[in-house]
């Protein structure tokens, strides 16, 4: 469905994706894990058509990533992507006009569940509220592939529960989900497959239970083992 074959990506002289190969299959939920700087965000941005790869092939349903694939792939970045002067109702109107698959009624329901109101200004949102808004916007697209980059960052425990519940509900529509997060323990109940990246490459990929059985340890313990040489907080 969404396939990377020996993909390379450079930012100036820095190689951020190196011989990256993986295929994401329809209807599955993938956890994309690894410390900062391992290529997770760049992989997502390339799939969303936001950055151009320098080598290899990247296709969606056999066709190169481009205008057509953007109609079917929704991507939530870690960066804010609204103007400060907007109210939430303006964000809704913008996405309704821009994306044919945007479900305005679903967006309204998600706002209610997330305890957000349409008249709130973007500049007045806390980091947690802004994160919830990004989730609501992205999940309101009826896309075939939904990519969420660190959706639990900056969220308190109650907010995380709301977001996890929302994602669980959304996974029932048959879309492929690709979710990057350091908080794997909280994503574990909804994940089908795990993808680990290091040095811009996919170094381990497979079904969650199969990886546990093969390595005889939890994903968290495996993470600590694989990334022991990288000084980052562990989940």
Name these PLM-found stretches.
Residues 146-150:
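Catalytic Walker B motif of ABC-type/P-loop ATPase nucleotide-binding domains
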Residues 2, 17-19:
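Conserved structural motif at the start of ABC-family nucleotide-binding domains
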Residues 78-133:
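ABC-family P-loop ATPase nucleotide-binding domains
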Residues 160-173:
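Helical segment within the ABC ATPase nucleotide-binding domain
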Residues 55-69:
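Conserved ABC transporter NBD signature motif
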Residues 48:
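Helix-to-loop junction immediately C-terminal to a conserved catalytic motif
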Residues 33-35:
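The feature captures the beta-strand-to-loop junction immediately N-terminal to the Walker
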């Amino acid at each position: 469905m969404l396939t990377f074959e020996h993909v390379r990506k450079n930012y100036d002289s820095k190689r951020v994706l190196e011989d990256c190969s993986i295929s994401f299959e329809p209807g599955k939920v993938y956890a994309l894990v690894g410390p900062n700087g391992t290529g997770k965000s760049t992989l997502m941005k390339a799939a969303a058509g936001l950055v151009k790869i320098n080598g290899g092939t990247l296709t969606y349903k056999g066709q190169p990533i481009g205008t057509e694939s953007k109609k079917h792939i929704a991507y939530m970045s870690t960066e804010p992507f609204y103007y400060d002067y907007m109210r939430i109702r303006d964000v809704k109107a913008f996405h309704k006009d821009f994306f044919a698959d945007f479900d305005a009624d679903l967006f309204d329901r998600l706002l209610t569940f997330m305890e957000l109101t349409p008249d709130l200004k973007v500049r007045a949102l806390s980091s947690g509220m802004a994160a919830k808004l990004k989730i609501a916007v992205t999940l309101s697209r009826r896309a075939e592939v939904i990519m969420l980059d660190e959706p639990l960052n900056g969220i308190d425990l109650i907010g995380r529960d709301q977001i996890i519940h929302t994602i669980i509900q959304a996974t029932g529509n048959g879309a492929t989900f690709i979710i990057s997060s350091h908080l794997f323990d909280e994503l574990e109940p909804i994940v089908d497959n795990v993808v680990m990246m290091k040095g811009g490459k996919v170094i381990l990929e497979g079904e969650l239970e199969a990886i546990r059985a093969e390595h005889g340890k939890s994903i968290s313990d495996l993470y600590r083992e694989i990334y022991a040489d990288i000084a980052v907080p562990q989940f």
